[in-house]
Design a protein with these regions (language model features):
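Acetyl-CoA-dependent GNAT
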Residues: 4-72, 95, 99, 127, ...
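Residue-level recognition of the GNAT/N-acetyltransferase active site
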Residues: 6, 76, 80, 109
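Conserved acetyl-CoA-binding loop-helix of GNAT-fold acetyltransferases
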Residues: 75, 81-94, 121
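Conserved GNAT acetyl-CoA-binding A-motif
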Residues: 96-108
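Conserved beta-strand-loop-alpha-helix junction that forms the acyl-donor binding cleft
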Residues: 106-115, 134-137
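Short acidic, glycine/proline-enriched helix-loop-strand junctions
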Residues: 114-127, 132
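Short helix-loop capping/hinge motifs at secondary-structure junctions, enriched
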Residues: 139-143
Length: 150
């Protein structure tokens, strides 16, 4: 079953993220409070997939009014190659389109070969001419990674 994500999905969602290789999680942004804030700002653009009571996939996406962003897309390994990720992404992109967004961006860690292949197969383009820059604007404690699986 595919449906909109709610904060009630958080514990299962965080467990899935934590056990996914190459998933970088930030202590502030990916905390329950951080995700709750994100869902309040983007209530219609995040989706989960359940098989019975088991969370098997999710997409976290939102926008700033100009561009859409996909932050985390994950499907449990034993449920991959069934079209779940594609369906979740399609739902997120359509939700962003309905909110007036005309371009969606995402980042994939260089080590995530399976992820890079997925996005290319879905018709996304890698923009080699862009550099990705980031600056934390909070204290060091809140910027730490929960964990990045190798």
């Amino acid at each position: 079953m595919l449906r909109k994500m709610t904060i009630e999905d958080y514990e299962a969602l965080f467990a899935m993220w934590s056990n996914t290789p190459n998933m970088g999680l930030r202590s502030l942004d990916d905390s329950k409070e951080g995700i709750s804030r994100f869902l309040e700002r983007n209530p219609n653009t995040n989706f989960v997939a359940y098989e019975g009571e088991i969370l098997v996939g999710a997409v976290l996406s939102g926008h700033d009014g100009r561009r859409g962003y996909i932050y985390h897309t994950v499907v449990l390994p034993e449920y991959r190659r069934r079209g779940i990720a594609s369906s979740l992404v399609d739902m997120a992109v359509e939700a962003l389109r309905q909110e007036g967004i005309t371009r969606v961006c995402l980042n994939v860690t260089e080590a995530n070969e399976e992820g890079k292949k997925f996005w290319l197969e879905k018709g996304w383009e890698k923009k080699d001419f862009l550099g990705f820059y980031s600056k934390a604007i909070t204290d060091k404690e809140n910027r730490q990674l929960f964990r990045v699986q190798p």
